Every structure is written in C-alpha cells, then in structure tokens.
Amino acid sequence: MASRTLPAVEPEEVAKDLLGLGPGLSREAYYGERSIFYNPGGVAPLGAIVASVKDRDGPRDKAAKLSREGVYRLAFCLPPDRFTERFGQPPRRPPKGGSVDVGGYDLTRLGELTPHPVYAWMRWVQILSPSRPQCQSLQPLQPESLEVVKARWAKTKRMAS
C-alpha cells in the first residue's frame, strides 16, 4: 500500500465535484455506490454511468480491497486513445463474475490511477482514496470521460428511434 502524506478527499466531496461537470448529470445510489449518471431530461430510469464512488467490496469485485478502513474507489472511463497511451491495449473481457488481467498493476495501492479490476476491458480506470492534488490532476480527464459517455448516449438514442 502506498504511504500517504496528504489526506484523502472525502468520497462525498468527490461525488459532488463530479456533478459539477455539466448539465444532465444526476447522482444515484446504484449497487451500493455513489454513481453519477448522464441522463439529460431524466428520460431514462438511470441514464449512462459517468463515474462511481464505491467504498466496499462487492461479491465479484474484491481485487482493490475496498473494505479497508477509509478506502474508497473513484472509477470512470477514459477515451480509447487516453487509455491506450497510459495502459496499452485494454485487457480482454473477463468471464462473468471474473476480474480482468491488468498485468503488474497493484490494484490496492492508494492514490494511483490503474486499470479498473473488473471494467478495464471497457477502458475504465480507478484511483483509490485520492488526495486533493490527485483529484486535481484527474480533472482534465473527467470532461473527456463525460464526452465518451455522451457519445455513447447519443448512439443509443439514435438506435432506439
């Protein structure tokens, strides 16, 4: 585990910051997480997930060891080129209930951006208990993440009409 010299930002504060990315965002409790969805006009039951803040392990998601005292995960997707330049090609989709093979990344390390242990195949990343400077360093990526979600949302809406 990484040594920590700066305190982690509180999970609630991270969720509130994400809501400030733009219009059409809402926060919902989803699978025990604080999830941020893109759902302009509230036309879908939830919308498309933009990011999540999770503070406990799930039945099929234990690799990050989120059940440790004070540990939570901020997770969001990256545009394909950003994911590839940082982590290489995304791993294969795991079998149902499995984790992806993320190579040598320590998925339990605090404050380090790593591939998501379950959703890296969809270009999702995680950072555990980020400090304020670490959150600030991620801010340029978050609007890009939202644009990926908006494009996916628009494609889904076109296919539905």
Task: Describe every region a protein language model picked out.
Residues 1-161:
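Charge-dense, helix-prone N-terminal extensions
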